[in-house]
Curated annotation (Swiss-Prot):
InterPro entries: AMPK1_CBM, ASC_dom, ASC_dom_sf, CRP1_MDG1_kinase, Ig-like_fold, Ig_E-set. Transmembrane segments: none annotated. Beta subunit of AMP-activated protein kinase (AMPK), which is required for transcriptional, metabolic, and developmental adaptations in response to glucose limitation. Has a structural role, mediating heterotrimer formation, and a regulatory role, defining carbon source-regulated subcellular location and substrate specificity of the AMPK kinase complex. This is 5'-AMP-activated protein kinase subunit beta. Residues 78-91 have a biased composition (Basic residues). GO terms for biological process: CAMKK-AMPK signaling cascade; induction of conjugation with cellular fusion; positive regulation of flocculation; signal transduction. Pfam families: AMPK1_CBM, AMPKBI. Residues 1-98 are annotated as: Disordered. Keywords: Cytoplasm. ADP binds at D250, Q251, S252. Belongs to the 5'-AMP-activated protein kinase beta subunit family. AMPK is a heterotrimer of an alpha catalytic subunit (ssp2), a beta (amk2) and a gamma non-catalytic subunits (cbs2). The beta subunit serves as a bridge between the catalytic and the regulatory subunit.
Amino acid sequence: MGNVQSQEGETRAHAVPSQDATTTPDNANNVPKEPRAQSMISIAADDLNQEGEMSDDNQQEGGNNRTSQNGTSGSSGHTKRRSQTSGKKTHQPYSGPCVPTIIRWRGGGEVVYVTGSFSRWKKKIQLLKSEDYTVLLQLRPGTQRFKFLVDGIWCCSSDFPTATDAEGNLYNYLEVEANEKLGASIDERLSQVHTDLPMEEKSESEQYSTEIPAFLTSNTLQELKLPKPPSLPPHLEKCILNSNTAYKEDQSVLPNPNHVLLNHLAAANTQLGVLALSATTRYHRKYVTTAMFKNFDV
């Protein structure tokens, strides 16, 4: 870059004649040809930062040289970017102890993988088959979200709780608790678990008998008011088939439902001996609502 700037300085020095050259042509050869080129060559990479810090003072003084002002403003922008990047916090990976956790799949299949937040949803881990598909993972404490890939199909296990993300996709999650005694053996952990179980109460509750419950034989107990069933959540009270369509000409087009309404069975009151059932499912970005009607004899 220094060579290029010196060449530009030489061309400018030859192109623009000085005042001495116009008055005394004999002394034109004695005048130094590249005073501006020397000033530009002397600017190094370290000097740019110093010029950037002094750019505000130069703007207040209002120098006549525009090229120097442009150079200082560019260098000041460079120093601002370096200060912003130096202020960013670097991500520190988790260095604490991990908890050995067994993840099990009991839904069958030939090839089963699992992926989740513990691998940033980028790596698939294959499960080993014995009686069921299992894998032992070293997970950090906290909430871990994951999903199974069974024969190329994404599935959720009924053995773990499920939740939905912002787009309505289902996934399993697991609360991994930090164990203080990570060095304890498996036998010690199993002994602690089995000693806490009330074995006697469990055996008494599983006894069979031929006695009929009293509330089935006594008329007074049948007349007692049972507690009311819990009311439906507010988002399930609004059925999509009862909403007004945006297109009056085409009644088959329905508005997009809330993701909590998916895979719920809705039933209408039996009127005129017809039973109506409906369910809404999702396939990628499309929603399909199916209504079924059947004759019902009261």
